[in-house]
Amino acid sequence: MTVDTAPQSHYQETKVSEIPIVILKSSATDDVAAHEAIEALKVAGVCIVRNLLDRSTVDKVRQELQPYDKQADSFEGFPKNYCQVAGLLSKSPTYAHSIVGNKLFTAVRNYFLTSTYECWAEKGTWMSVKSPPQLDSTLALYVNPGSGDQGLHRDDATQQNWNSGASEYSLGRDSGCAMMVALTECAREDGTTRFIPGSHLWDYQYDHPSNDDPRIRYAEMRPGDAYLMLSSVIHAGSVNYSTDRRRVLAAVFAARSHLRQVENQYLTYDIETVRTFPTWLQRFMGYSLSKLFQGWVDKKDPLLVVDPNAQPEGEDDGGMKPNEGEHVVEAQI
């Protein structure tokens, strides 16, 4: 799709010049790291988390995804040699548990994407409800040798999100966020993602900068590192100049609960496969209600289709608890 006319380009300032880095030293620092990541995302729209996963976990994800590597397809709108594999929840249990259910990412997505809605329910009754985010899509991203530059873009265009310029971040600005974990070395020369830190606060009416903009920064990572980004930040995949190095990322995207999912979770996985997932994941992927009572089946909680004995929402984890049996990071900022 092309646009015949658009507002002219306009230089927009940023308050940050580099991608912030959060170092996760041990599980005891999860709360601190979540707080640091949230603060960094407010300022820059993107941050790198060092040591999110240990090497054995990374290797296990790669091993589980390896049978699907040859099935990686190119997609319309992406550069040549840029391939993806979708539907990862059933392809890699380790990905589902350690990446989708990662405690730090859970805290980040809940902070930025939990929707609060208030209204008069009826005469004399004021109502306030909160809906946690939902899974948007799951992808393994492969940038093969010879892959070209992806165009700078914002991911929230798929959700038809639109923002005016802002001097500082306010909750409600974003419709989605993502975390991408490095499964290989991710260096500038082999196609790592590039960003314009601070562009999440820009006015959407103006065109994106050119690929040689001096404010562009590259998310260079080692296996087990990750970057988190808000869907409002301008970014793109890059040229892989190497002749023998394939850059691989495992990505998870989240969105507000009332939006249509980019990846159709209900057709991607058959119901018998969904029944093998833990309750928190079933709810997060969409078998739950977005307040007020959106997404019902026969006027009931959709999780009852998966498990007729499921507890009503609010009496179990409600989709908020990753890695069942583990402590949940609560982001209180």
Swiss-Prot record:
Pathway as given in its UniProt record: Alkaloid biosynthesis
| Region (Disordered) residue spans | 309-333
Annotated keywords: Dioxygenase, Iron, Metal-binding, Oxidoreductase
Q: What is its EC number?
A: 1.14.11.-
- What's the subunit arrangement here? Homodimer.
Q: What does this protein do?
A: Dioxygenase; part of the gene cluster that mediates the biosynthesis of communesins, a prominent class of indole alkaloids with great potential as pharmaceuticals. Communesins are biosynthesized by the coupling of tryptamine and aurantioclavine, two building blocks derived from L-tryptophan. The L-tryptophan decarboxylase cnsB converts L-tryptophan to tryptamine, whereas the tryptophan dimethylallyltransferase cnsF converts L-tryptophan to 4-dimethylallyl tryptophan which is further transformed to aurantioclavine by the aurantioclavine synthase cnsA, probably aided by the catalase cnsD.
Report what the protein is called.
Dioxygenase cnsJ
| Organism from which the protein derives | Penicillium expansum (Blue mold rot fungus)
